[in-house]
Amino acid sequence: MSALRTRLDELIAQTDLEVSEKQREQLVGYVELLDKWNKAYNLTSVRDPLEMLVKHILDSIVVSTHLPGERFIDVGTGPGLPGIPLAIMNPEKTFFLLDSLGKRIRFIKQVVHTLGLKNVTAIQSRVEEFQPEEKFDGVLSRAFASMTDMVEWCHHLPKQDSGVFLALKGLHPKDEIDLLPEWCSVTEVISLAVPELEGDRHLVILSRKEN
């Protein structure tokens, strides 16, 4: 068993997540591809694949039990984070991964092909220019500096009545919550336990206020 797989198993054992043999292999395969492509294309500032397991894989998959609905878009996905790990964890749900940079989308398409992911679609577009035929149950991102930017730039993406925004943040973002636009409200703030990650992690679930 590879050092990556051994380390991944150790980390997962510190959570309540149920992760199958196939999913573990796919998560390791994703890290191996990210490490390989990163050397040429600079997709992430994290250089050590063992560190990627904590900062990219575990940091993403701890969200997998908090996904309401079936259809999701990961905005500003970069090299596929959190979208690829979440798609691996939730093969019955559909994920669209959006980024404006071609090299990132090419990488994601390679991952999808290599790992045989049937539930991921990569889209190269700026978020404000992307007009989906069908709206989403959840709009995910860990890329936005502010939640106000996230909800304003992505306001056209969630389903009108039931769609939510899912923002992955570090410290509890009280100051950001105070600055949210009038039409947006915080449904829940969930403290996430990421094994061996320094610092706090929170998932903020936001929705449109009911008229």
From Swiss-Prot:
Presence of keyword Glycosyltransferase: no
SUPFAM superfamilies from the UniProt entry: S-adenosyl-L-methionine-dependent methyltransferases
Enzyme class: transferase
Name this protein carries in UniProt: Ribosomal RNA small subunit methyltransferase G
HAMAP family, per database record: 16SrRNA_methyltr_G
Function per UniProt: Specifically methylates the N7 position of guanine in position 527 of 16S rRNA.
Sorted UniProt keywords: Cytoplasm, Methyltransferase, rRNA processing, S-adenosyl-L-methionine, Transferase
Subcellular location: Cytoplasm
Pfam families: GidB
Major site of localization recorded for this protein: cytoplasm
Binding residue positions for S-adenosyl-L-methionine: G76, L81, V127, E128, R142
Superkingdom of origin organism: Bacteria
Gene3D superfamilies from the UniProt entry: Vaccinia Virus protein VP39
EC number(s) per entry: 2.1.1.170
Family matches, as NCBIfam families: rsmG_gidB
Catalytic reaction(s) noted: guanosine(527) in 16S rRNA + S-adenosyl-L-methionine = N(7)-methylguanosine(527) in 16S rRNA + S-adenosyl-L-homocysteine
InterPro entries hit by this protein: rRNA_ssu_MeTfrase_G (IPR003682), SAM-dependent_MTases_sf (IPR029063)
Similarity comment: family membership: Belongs to the methyltransferase superfamily. RNA methyltransferase RsmG family.
A GO MF label: rRNA (guanine-N7-)-methyltransferase activity
Gene Ontology, cellular component aspect: cytosol
